[in-house]
Amino acid sequence: MHSFSTLPNHRIGLYILWTIPVLFVIFKLLAPAKCSLPIVNGRRWFEIGQYQARRRFSLDGRGIILKGLQKARAFRVVSQKGPKIILGPEYANEVKSHPACNADVFIAKEFHAHVSGFEVLRPQHVMKDAIRLKLTRSIGALMRPISDETTLILETQWGNSNCWHELDLKSTIAALVSRVSAVMFVGEELGRDQKWLSIVTNYSSDMFVADLDLCKWPEILRPIATYFLSSCGKLRRHIQEAALMLDPILSEGNSTHGNKQNFLDWFEEIAGGRKYNPVLAQISLAAAAIDTTSDLIIQTLTDICRFPDSEKLQEELREEMVRVLRADGWEKSAMYNLKLLDSVLKETQRVKPVVVFGMGRYVTEQITLHDGTVIPKGETINVVNTRVWDSAVYENPLEWDPYRFLRRRDSGDHAAHLVSPTPDHMGFGLGKHSCPGRFFAATKIKILLCHILLKYDVKISDEASSKVVSSGNFLFPDATLRISVRRRQENLSIWD
């Protein structure tokens, strides 16, 4: 038997010629099926790589998506994070319950949950169960503590002056939301600690930067690249610092003070022996609670102040708040009966949602959708939330109408409630993976806005910019906006 090195050159050449097509066939058989959907913002003929296509998406993601929907109902885009499949809203009900469309795997892959610093994004089933089984059922008991904490924060940060004074809207609302949330999640001592608040607040914003930095690297190199990127190093430091602060409380074996319970207790109870990381769970919980809640409050206050008849709207909201709170107090029924406020919030979430597309799913097996559209195994898909701007669904869709959902609710439309997601309004997602904490979030937002509007007059300068900032898939309120406030003389009996 000849060794390969002793074979004649012509026979070596024949082996190579036969090997290449065999390997090609093997690779073709093992490789994922190629997606045939059109790509709407690919690289131009003179461009090398996808850098410019990604940059264009970063600058005008919403515009690219809307143009894509004019050409096809299912297509691909080159996003800041690479190629994605985008589906029209008519696929929402199909995707939400399809067994081959996995939300947990999508989140893990989309946000590098296997990479150091991003462990917070790993599926947190204990957290989801605690929200569903404990938090949602405890909303009534938490309303008074939320109100009391809001009072303390506003007195310190907004003051009691009856003269107009300006506040940075983004930072003051983020501080309010983060502290109220933290006190409910980890108790008063840690929840009021500025270092803890800084950690849980900054992790989310720093993760956004680190995520985009990491996406510039090939996926196979990201577990290594994370150790060379300063933005990823920040995430690891946040986690380490959070552990140093939380571990002493956890080591006591009892986080409960008096008869008050918080998520530290609920996690242990719900875990029931299941393995979980309480530090990662707390950071994940805070990130979910702070960003979207702050976003909605900031944009709602902006919309109220920008409304042509702002003073009249503010008085109508205050009249409703006083009437309802006098009748119901801080009970769950009060939140249900704040119908105008609910309409205002849902309308703000409609006109400026947090994202253009959501419902991210990883396709575990090739699927064929109702119209014959084939999605290969291994692809990630997203469903657009663009019906919120569709004139076939909403009259004058680009106009902010604070009474829109109040009219719909009065006509018997049960989907007009803030916490009721539909394919026409997916602000909280859709289906079994819709935001599990939306009931708590809606309650917290309403309580905070009751305090703000009843205790303060608010306005925004006519000269101030309040444009929505688009960055890829995300829509952000204007981060530079300042709000003017002054203390009002409200009926204090409603806070008793």
Curated annotation (Swiss-Prot):
GO biological process, one term: terpenoid biosynthetic process
Record membrane topology: Single-pass membrane protein
Cofactor: heme
Residues annotated to bind heme: C435
Pfam families for the chain: p450 (PF00067)
Ranges that cross the membrane: 12-32
InterPro entries linked: Cyt_P450, Cyt_P450_CS, Cyt_P450_E_grp-IV, Cyt_P450_sf
Chief subcellular location: membrane
Other notes: In A.calidoustus, the austinoid gene cluster lies on a contiguous DNA region, while clusters from E.nidulans and P.brasilianum are split in their respective genomes. Genetic rearrangements provoked variability among the clusters and E.nidulans produces the least number of austionoid derivatives with the end products austinol and dehydroaustinol, while P.brasilianum can produce until acetoxydehydroaustin, and A.calidoustus produces the highest number of identified derivatives.
Role according to the record: Cytochrome P450 monooxygenase; part of the gene cluster B that mediates the biosynthesis of the fungal meroterpenoid acetoxydehydroaustin. The first step of the pathway is the synthesis of 3,5-dimethylorsellinic acid by the polyketide synthase ausA. 3,5-dimethylorsellinic acid is then prenylated by the polyprenyl transferase ausN. Further epoxidation by the FAD-dependent monooxygenase ausM and cyclization by the probable terpene cyclase ausL lead to the formation of protoaustinoid A.
Protein name: Cytochrome P450 monooxygenase ausR
